[in-house]
């Protein structure tokens, strides 16, 4: 069982309630794959950061949590580009998945 955190972005096209529904579904998929969700993070963004998907402040917040709780996996509710996945993996130093990769893992 891997300690896992979920990350979702709330955009102008998606309200908080819809984001919660998506994260609920992602948590179910994570549990099905054998992960244990220890925290959820969300960020309000008009458009995701092309390099790291999240803003720098949220990256620091998530990184501090990863270090404190010994998280092994971070799962994003949205699809990441290969470059974003690489960049985030270097920063967080743990396994990074997006929704599509999680579903393929199941």
Would you name each region that the model predicts?
Residues 1-105:
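N-terminal accessory targeting/assembly segments
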């Amino acid at each position: 069982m891997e300690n896992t955190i979920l990350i979702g972005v709330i955009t102008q096209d998606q309200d908080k309630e819809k984001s919660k529904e998506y994260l609920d579904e992602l948590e179910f998929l994570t549990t099905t794959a054998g992960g244990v969700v220890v925290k959820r993070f969300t960020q309000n963004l008009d458009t995701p950061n092309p390099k790291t998907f999240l803003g720098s402040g949220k990256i620091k917040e998530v990184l501090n949590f990863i270090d404190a709780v010994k998280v092994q996996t971070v799962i994003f509710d949205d699809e990441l580009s290969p470059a974003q996945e690489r960049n985030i993996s270097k920063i967080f130093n743990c396994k990074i998945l997006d929704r599509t990769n999680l579903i393929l893992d199941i």
